Swiss-Prot record:
Record text on subunit structure and interactions: The complex is comprised of an extracytoplasmic solute-binding protein and a heteromeric permease formed by two transmembrane proteins.
Record's function text: Solute-binding protein that binds indole-3-pyruvate and indole-3-acetate (in vitro). Can also bind D-tryptophan (in vitro), but that is probably not a physiological ligand. Probably part of a tripartite ATP-independent periplasmic (TRAP) transport system that mediates solute transport into the cytoplasm.
Main location: periplasm
NCBIfam families in UniProt: TRAP_S1
Protein family per UniProt: Belongs to the bacterial solute-binding protein 7 family.
Alphabetical list of InterPro entries matching this protein: DctP_fam, TRAP_DctP_sf
Binding site residues for (indol-3-yl)acetate: Y99, R172, T210, S211, L212, D213, Y235
Name of the protein in question: Solute-binding protein Dde_0634
Xref: Pfam families: DctP
Keywords for this protein: Periplasm, Signal, Transport
Length: 340
């Protein structure tokens, strides 16, 4: 009787342990799902980057991680993206630093007209600057990668052939680019990019000051028939992750995500540089958009006009305990390394 009872106990124990093993294996095989929120339309470069990054994560983790993407403000909008990721409404989000004035005193150096002519160089320098400095302003989130827009130009309803034509013109800009517009005599109007097409169509603004990919991606070629080349500042972006969501990931998955950071900064810039050229060809050929170049004396005047913005940034950074001279030296060294 005792031997029969013992045999039953062994059998039950084997069944239970087998069930537990199967359950743990099933749990281990279950992919982690991450929500990635973005605010501009799906056709724009931050969302193209999002989809490419999600694909790479799925592939390189061999299915351990799935990424659900939410473009066009379907999960979080531009104004609440930072807060939403920090509170866990989304695991991952893309933020435009320009939409958060005063929050990023060090990294907002990238809103200044630093002289970049390529998004690839600007994006790589931005990521290297962050990686080297790790400023406290971003320590509450995990930064997965950073990248920039292409250099900013004027897209306007009426032609801008000189700085005189800009005087008093209502132009959309964000962050420091609004301040650049003001220094040049325009009337800056700040609003998230998804609101801009309607504002142009209603005549609330007469144009925008940003990179030329939106001529095609957001169909501004139909609304603004003129482009004035200015090669002004870029817009910096950061892909951020909720800290608790990051810490829940296994070390091997964290390693994959970290390995994508510099690679994706360069990939996004490279994609954008090619796409800007494509967008402008399309805008000129299909919509007859006219391209204007400012006179040399106006270009020199622009450089002089924006110098106070560098001084103001340096003061804000110093007030937050940063060394603005060291930051600018690092930017200059990295810019020389990666080219303009």
């Amino acid at each position: 009787m005792k031997s029969t009872f013992a045999a039953l106990l062994i059998m039950v124990g084997c069944l239970v342990s087998g069930a537990l093993l199967t359950g743990s294996e099933a749990a281990a095989a279950q992919p982690v799902t991450l929500n990635y929120a973005n605010f501009p339309p799906a056709s724009t470069f931050p969302c193209i980057q999002m989809e490419q990054w999600a694909h790479e994560v799925r592939t390189r983790t061999r299915g351990k991680v799935d990424v659900l993407t939410y473009p066009g403000g379907t999960l979080l909008g531009a104004r609440n993206m930072l807060r939403g990721v920090m509170s866990g409404q989304a695991d991952i989000g893309c933020i435009s630093l320009a939409y958060h004035p005063g929050v990023f005193p060090v990294m907002s150096v990238f809103e200044l007209p630093l002289g970049f002519t390529s998004a690839e160089a600007a994006s790589s320098v931005l990521w290297e600057l962050y990686s080297g400095l790790r400023p406290a302003e971003l320590e509450r989130v995990k930064v997965l990668t950073m990248f920039t827009s292409a250099p900013s130009h004027f897209m306007t309803v009426t032609p801008v052939r000189s700085l005189r034509d800009l005087q008093g013109m209502e132009i959309r800009g964000a962050g420091t680019l609004s301040a650049i517009l003001e220094k040049l005599g325009a009337t800056p109007v700040s609003m998230p990019m998804p609101e801009v097409p309607e504002a142009v169509q209603k005549g609330i603004i007469k144009g925008l000051f940003t990179s030329l990919d939106v001529m095609k991606d957001m169909n501004f070629a139909e609304m603004t028939g003129h482009v004035t080349r200015a090669d002004q500042a870029v817009y910096p972006f950061a892909v951020i992750m909720n800290r608790e969501a990051w810490e829940r990931l296994s070390p091997d998955v964290q390693q994959v995500l970290d390995g994508l950071a510099a690679e994706h900064a360069a990939w996004t810039g490279r994609y954008l540089d090619a796409h800007v050229q494509d967008s402008m060809r399309w805008a000129e050929e299909k919509h007859g958009v006219q391209v204007h170049t400012l006179p040399e004396e106006d270009i020199a005047a622009m450089r002089r006009s924006v110098q106070p913005l560098f001084d103001a940034w340096a003061q804000r950074a110093a007030d937050k305990g940063a060394d603005p001279d060291a930051v600018m030296r690092t930017v200059d060294a990295l810019k020389a390394q990666y080219g303009g």
